[in-house]
Every structure is written in C-alpha cells, then in structure tokens.
C-alpha cells in the first residue's frame, strides 16, 4: 500500500442525541468535542440524531408523524383544480 494517501482512521465515540446512548467505533470523522470513555482514554465525540437505539425500525416503536399540515398545504395549493375534459 502507498503511504500517506489514506485518511486517518481512529476510534470515535458516537452519542445518540435523543437517548444519550454512546458507543465507540472506528471512523474517519473528527470532532473538537471529546469524551472520556470507560477505558480512561479520551476520544472525539460525535453527536448524531438517530442510531439503532432510537430508530423506529430497530426499536419497534412507531412515531406519530404530523401529516395534517402537509395535507392542508396540498389542499390549499391543488384543492380547487379540476380535471381537463377530453376532447
């Protein structure tokens, strides 16, 4: 392999913003924030919105999505339109 062409691949801690669950893995991602891990070492901390701990597919929980606002917006835009008659 050629030297000095690969990105820095190092341990990083990812934290789920909604559940607070943290896990360590290896990544090329970097961050100015750090956290002390269970082994006593400090690692870069990356906060993410969704992980397997909070995603509905993995948890089995369903979230209620606010579709009423979308439907009302659609009705305002296109509700008064009629189909064109065929000639």
From Swiss-Prot:
Key words of the record: Ribonucleoprotein, Ribosomal protein
Keyword Metal-binding among UniProt keywords: no
Source species, domain of life: Bacteria
GO molecular function: structural constituent of ribosome
Family: Belongs to the bacterial ribosomal protein bL31 family. Type B subfamily.
Function comment: Binds the 23S rRNA.
The protein's name: Large ribosomal subunit protein bL31B
Organism of this sequence: Corynebacterium jeikeium (strain K411)
Gene designation: rpmE2
